[in-house]
Structures are given as C-alpha cells and as structure tokens.
C-alpha cells in the first residue's frame, strides 16, 4: 500500500494505504461532496462533485478515482471548482422533480443538502426530460424515476453487495434512466425487498414504502387494540435522530414514546427470538442426530429466504423451518388475543417496528396470513417511527424510562444480539453447548462469529462432533459460498445469512448511517447482552413455561413454517 505526503489546500497531509485521493482529503478533515461514492462499492466517478484541481498541471480530476502520490499538490475549493460544482447542481435540479416539501426524503436528501450548501438559489436551465410513472408495486420500496440523478448507487449496491442486478441503466442521453430490465415493475422482478437501493439513494428516487397513515388510523380507532413489538436493532439506532449516540440502548424511552402516541401495549421481539433460538437449536440437534440435511441455513432474514426461492430453490430443504422472531410473535399474539378480542369486542392490531424493509414483504406472505388477516398487520421501519415521534413533537432524549409490558417483554442477551451479524449463530451455539459456564460464554464470544467480515468461518465441538459454522453478510457473498458448497470445496453444518451489512443494524429501515455507525450499533447490542439478566434463551422463564404449556404439536404449528418454490 502506498505511503507518502501530499499537499491539500496548502496543508501537508500524510497518507498510508488510502485507496484514493478522496479518502486522504476526508482524512484531512475536508468534507468533499459526492453523490456516487461509497467506500464499500466500486468507484464510479460519474457525479464529478468530488473533483480537485492539480496545482502543477491545472487539470481537474475526480478525487474518488485518483490514487494518492507522494508530492501531489491539489486544491479542493478554488473558484473554478466551486463554479463547476454549482453548475452540476443546477443541471441536476433542472431535470429533477423539485417538490421537496412533500418528498419522502426531504430533510435527508443529499441533493437538497448540497444545493443549500453551495448556495444554489435559482436554476438557469430548462427542464426537457419526460415525466415517468411512479412504481409502487414493491411491498418494500417506491421508485420515482422523476427524482433520479443517475448516480448509479442503487445499480452498484444491488449488483455488488447483493449480486442481484435488479436495476441498471437504460437508454442514452437525456432519455437515460435507471430501471429494471425490459421496463418491468419492481414486483415483476426477482427483487428480495432488502431496500439497500433506498438506503444508498441520495434523493427521493427510491424510498422505503411509507405506511405511517395506516398506523395512525389504527391507533386512533377505538375499536382496535394496538400492540407493538420492537426488534433488537431498533433500540440502538432510533435515538440517533434525537442526538443520542449510535449504539445507545433507548428501548425503555421508546416504550414511553409509543405509549404517549396512544399504543395500548408494547412488547419486545427478543421474546420471540428466544422462542426461535430454542426451536432452531432443537431442529439443528435433530439434524445432527439424523445426518442432515446440511448445511442448515438460518431463516430469520426474509430477503435471504426470498433469494433462495428465486435463485436456488434446491436449498429450500436446508433452510430452518423456524419462523422469524417477528412471525413467531405474530403467531403467538394471534393465538393469545383471540379469546380476549371476542370478550371485549375489540380487534387486536399488531404492528412490528423493524430495521428491515423486507419485513414488510414477509408480513404479506401467504404463509403468515390466517383467516384473511396477516399475523402481523403492519410493519413500520425505524425511520417511520422516528417520523411519527417528530410529528407528535416527542423528544425521545427527554423521556422517562418505561419497560416493555409483560409477559411478552422479556428476552435474553442471546436474543438481543439477533440484531447484529453472527448473533443468531451465537445464540444457537450458546443453547446447544452443554457447558453453560461464564467461561464458556467468553469462549463463544471469540469464536469468530462476530465482526463485519464478508464471510466468517469457525468450528465448535459439541459432544464428539466438530461442527463447522459460517456467517455471511450480503447476498453476493452468500452466492459465492453456495458455489463453493456446490463444487464440493466447502462443507458446513450451520450457516447464518444476513442480507444487510452488519446484520439487522444495517437494515434499510434504519437511520442513514456510515459503516462506523453500524459498527457502533452492533457494539451497543453486545453491551446490552453483557448487561442482560440472563444470556441464554432457555433461561427465559416465560418462554420455557409457554412452550411447556403449548406442547410439542402446538409449538410446531405456531413456530414452524415450510417454504416451497
């Protein structure tokens, strides 16, 4: 990796392994504007906002695609460069739907932010672009081509991180668009609803489908009892919108906020995750006893399940039959509230607050609809709940603490870490290992299941059997691992797959954050695990009691599902 010294705006700045000049500039504390640059994606260099001026040659080049060289002298904010950036912004705005006040991304739109930053107050160019139909067919995202600035971020994240290639460029010149192949609607593609395209989109061209109106209607309906479950990853991210550091657990404040908003009962999805851990562990041990099929894949991530259905259905027999924690809670609520609804004449309306856009798709799956109603009536993302709190004028950081309601508000530390990569696999290992000591917990924590590496591999011994485990981030990496398995190059007993970087903490429904922000959220969940009253699912007294009351047959009916192509 290159090392050296360069001059940026007259200041000496060292570099040591940075992959481009842009990284060195940002290291120097200069916030260089970009639309199309993400450090985890390939360099595209299309937006030209990050251009710098070479003091020696006078040339203007994109800093994202320049390698740093020893002795290089550049300027980042000359009069020439500022004019260049303003013209780019004017051209983008000229062909952009500028209904900013009603845009879903207003306040978070990067184009809006940079236009304000660079003082673009008028647009001198005429808009000659056509107007295109909005695509609202996806259960998770909405695509508005009229707000697209052709940065290519969605194209690259879909191809490079997920290996799906759902979106790409079509046509040329002023007719250029980003769209699915053959101008299909999103619902006509093999999109898995991960929503990462919306997470990286700098404008309102792709946004998470907003269902806030449905939530308010339910809350204000006196004939409805609104019950909410909160996923683990939400508690360490929702506070970011209120000045609370990423990773700080604000679950008890969020419970207070939801009660102020008019929600009747608030529960914790970790309760369902403990059910999942026990059921999935029992299934895994049964497979070990019967010799497979292996690998057993985790089933918590609905985008991963959808990917297997679309791309590799032969592996559906390998996926765990356990429902996700969200859907386990949904099934239990459906069972527990049926009699109560009949007695008091109200209808229980079940909302799940999730970090994940694919959960919107999962809730609508026919496997989870009974008697014409879904087990989870509505899924709201962390973003949507933030918007609802802000609409109410609630300042989360100033609220008192209130614990989730019982009996469905109690979860283990193992359940909390479901929200970060490696958490599901670690929870299963904790349950399956016969050694339940604190020392065993410490050893499990350093097995290699944690961290953001694309593919993590480790071994653990249970009884006389050495088990091979893998944890995967991103569907593109999952595809690579499946290829190795197909070709006989790899064998595993258990594989956890999470579609989003870092696991659920990096879900597309979370506040927009850098990679370091996602890491802090994951660290926050591990800290909550460390502080938990009990660390293993089988130590949850309510879950253990309920499973005993239900019995094996009823548990299987409520907690398991099969996926068929």
Regions found by a protein language model. Give the residues of each.
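A short, structure-level motif marking secondary-structure boundaries and short turns
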Residues: 5-8, 97, 130, 139-141, ...
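A generic secondary-structure micro-motif detector
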Residues: 10-12, 101, 134, 187, ...
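Iron-sulfur-associated redox domains of electron-transfer enzymes in respiratory
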Residues: 5, 12, 16-73, 77-83, ...
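Fe-S ferredoxin-like electron-transfer domains
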Residues: 48-193, 199, 206-218, 224-225
């Amino acid at each position: 990796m290159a090392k050296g010294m360069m001059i940026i705006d007259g200041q000496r700045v060292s570099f040591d392994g940075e992959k481009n000049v842009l990284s060195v500039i940002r290291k120097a504390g200069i916030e260089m504007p970009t639309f199309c640059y993400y450090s985890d994606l390939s360099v595209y260099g299309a937006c030209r906002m990050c251009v710098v001026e070479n003091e020696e040659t006078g040339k203007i080049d994109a800093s994202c695609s320049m390698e740093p060289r020893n002795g290089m002298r550049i300027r980042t904010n000359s009069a020439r460069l500022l004019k260049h950036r303003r013209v780019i912004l004017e051209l983008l705005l000229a062909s952009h739907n500028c209904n900013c006040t009603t845009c879903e991304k207003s306040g978070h739109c990067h184009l809006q932010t940079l236009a304000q930053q660079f003082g673009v107050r008028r647009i001198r160019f005429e808009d000659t672009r056509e107007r295109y139909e909005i695509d609202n067919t996806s259960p998770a995202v909405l695509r508005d081509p009229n707000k697209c600035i052709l940065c290519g971020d969605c194209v690259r994240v879909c191809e490079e991180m997920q290996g799906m290639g759902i979106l790409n460029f079509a046509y040329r010149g002023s007719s250029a668009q980003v769209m699915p192949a053959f101008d299909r609607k999103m619902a006509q593609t093999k999109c898995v609803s991960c929503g990462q395209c919306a997470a990286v989109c700098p404008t309102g061209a792709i946004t998470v489908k907003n269902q806030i109106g449905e939530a308010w209607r339910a809350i204000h309906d006196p004939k409805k009892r609104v019950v909410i479950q909160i996923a683990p990853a939400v508690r360490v991210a929702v506070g970011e919108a209120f000045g609370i550091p990423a990773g700080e657990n604000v679950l008890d404040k969020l419970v207070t906020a939801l009660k102020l908003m008019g929600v009747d009962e608030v529960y914790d999805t970790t309760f369902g995750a403990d059910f999942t851990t026990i059921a999935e562990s029992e299934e895994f041990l049964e497979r070990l006893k019967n010799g497979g099929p292996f690998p057993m894949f985790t089933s918590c991530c609905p985008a991963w399940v959808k990917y297997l259905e679309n791309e590799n259905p032969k592996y559906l027999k390998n996926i765990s039959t356990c429902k996700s924690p969200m859907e386990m809670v949904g099934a239990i609520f459906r069972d527990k509230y049926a009699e109560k609804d009949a007695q008091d004449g109200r209808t229980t309306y079940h909302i799940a607050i999730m970090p994940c856009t694919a959960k919107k798709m999962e809730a609508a799956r026919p496997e989870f609809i009974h008697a014409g109603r879904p087990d989870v009536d509505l899924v709201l993302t962390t973003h949507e709940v933030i918007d609802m709190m802000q609409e109410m004028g609630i300042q989360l950081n100033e609220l008192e603490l209130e614990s989730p309601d019982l009996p469905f508000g109690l979860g283990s530390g193992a359940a909390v870490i479901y929200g970060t990569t490696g958490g599901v696999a670690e929870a299963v290992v904790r349950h399956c290992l016969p050694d339940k000591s604190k020392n065993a917990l410490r050893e499990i924590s350093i097995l290699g299941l944690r961290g953001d590496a694309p593919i993590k591999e480790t071994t653990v011994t249970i009884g006389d059997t050495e088990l091979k485990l893998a944890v995967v981030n991103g569907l593109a990496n999952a595809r690579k691992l499946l290829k190795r398995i197909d070709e006989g190059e790899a064998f595993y007993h258990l594989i956890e797959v999470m579609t989003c970087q870092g696991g659920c903490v990096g879900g597309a429904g979370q506040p927009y954050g850098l990679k370091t922000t996602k890491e802090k959220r994951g660290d926050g969940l591990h800290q909550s695990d460390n502080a938990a009253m009990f660390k293993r699912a089988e130590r949850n007294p309510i879950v253990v009691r309920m499973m005993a009351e239900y019995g094996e047959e009823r548990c299987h009916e409520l907690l398991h599902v099969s996926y068929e192509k």
